[in-house]
Amino acid sequence: MDHDKLEANLLDHALTKYLKSTKQLDEATVPKHVNNVRGFILRIIYRHGSCTIKDILKEVTLSPSATTTALNHLEQEGFIERSRNNNDRRTVWITLSESGRGAAEQMIENRQQLIDGMFERLTAEEKKTFLAIIAKLAQ
C-alpha cells in the first residue's frame, strides 16, 4: 500500500469512527425522527439564528428539492418555523422552535463531548497543530 493510500485510509477510519460515535450519541439523546440530514440542517439554522433556504443550501450537499423536503418534515414535527419577509414576500425566514433549539443544542453538546474525549489524549501542542491543520483543510 503506498503512502497516500495509507493516509487516506487513516483519515477515512478516523472520520467514520467520529460519525458513528455522533450517530450513537444522537440516537440516545435526540428524538428518533431527527436523522443525520435533518440534524445537520437544525445545526445550520442554530448557527445562523434565522436564515433562508439559500443560506442552508450553501452549506449542504443536498439538492434544493431534498432540502425543502427535509425542511417540510422538520416543520411538520415542530422543530422549525417559517415566516415571510414583510418587505419581500418571496423571502421565507426559517427559525428554530423551542424543541428545534433543544435538539440542536443536544447534538452540539454530543459533538463537544466526543471532541473533548478525543482531545484528552493530546498535548496542548498537538491540539494546536491539529486545529491548524483542520483549519487549513477547511479553507
Curated annotation (Swiss-Prot):
DNA-binding region at which residues?
53-76
Which GO molecular function terms does the record list? DNA binding; DNA-binding transcription factor activity
Q: PROSITE patterns of this UniProt entry?
A: HTH_MARR_2 (PS50995)
Return the SUPFAM superfamilies for the record. Answer: Winged helix' DNA-binding domain
Does Ribonucleoprotein show up as a keyword for this record? no
What are the GO BP annotations of this UniProt entry? regulation of DNA-templated transcription; response to stress
Disulphide linkage map: none
HTH marR-type domain: residues covered = 8-139
Establish whether keyword Phosphoprotein is in the entry. Answer: no
Q: Which keywords belong to this entry?
A: DNA-binding, Transcription, Transcription regulation
InterPro entries in UniProt: HTH_MarR-typ, MarR/SlyA-like, WH-like_DNA-bd_sf, WH_DNA-bd_sf
Pfam families reported in the protein's UniProt record: MarR (PF01047)
Origin superkingdom:
Bacteria
- PANTHER family recorded for this chain? HTH-TYPE TRANSCRIPTIONAL REPRESSOR YETL, TRANSCRIPTIONAL REGULATOR, MARR FAMILY
This protein's name:
Uncharacterized HTH-type transcriptional regulator YwhA
What organism is this sequence from? Bacillus subtilis (strain 168)
Q: Which gene encodes it?
A: ywhA
